[in-house]
């Protein structure tokens, strides 16, 4: 029977001023009929009775923190710093931003890469002289001939 004995739980209690009975803190009234007044209601009643002064108004209102705004100082140093920051941001704008969220599909990424390659490809042989082009073509022909001969042996 000792194993099944319930564990004693201590509750937060308050005592009733009329009957000295222990009542749970969450209860607003005692079984004897006494009603506990909450601190919020007590403070509200006090503020209704006495008109609050300018100091009490600030205390009675809930304190709200406001965002502190810094004043901008007009100086050439600050302007130079702003210009530097802007120039950096412009240089970063060249990079393509990655899309946020879940990617649509893998094929869309491949299409983007192909587009980038097409845009980046520049004809490096456009400014090539005829003599250089002939030398390169002869070199390529020799390389191709060697590769073909290797395949025939295997």
Curated annotation (Swiss-Prot):
Indicate what this protein is called per its UniProt record. UPF0547 protein C16orf87
What top-level branch of life does the organism fall under? Answer: Eukaryota
Q: Which InterPro entries does this chain map to?
A: C16orf87-like (IPR040246), UPF0547 (IPR018886)
Phosphoserine sites (modified residues): 91
Compositional bias (Basic and acidic residues):
68-84, 109-119
Q: Which family does it belong to?
A: Belongs to the UPF0547 family.
Transmembrane segment boundaries? none
**Keyword entries, A-Z:** Coiled coil, Phosphoprotein
Residue spans making up a coiled coil are: 104-132
Region named Disordered:
43-119
One Pfam entry name: UPF0547
Q: From which organism does this entry originate?
A: Homo sapiens (Human)
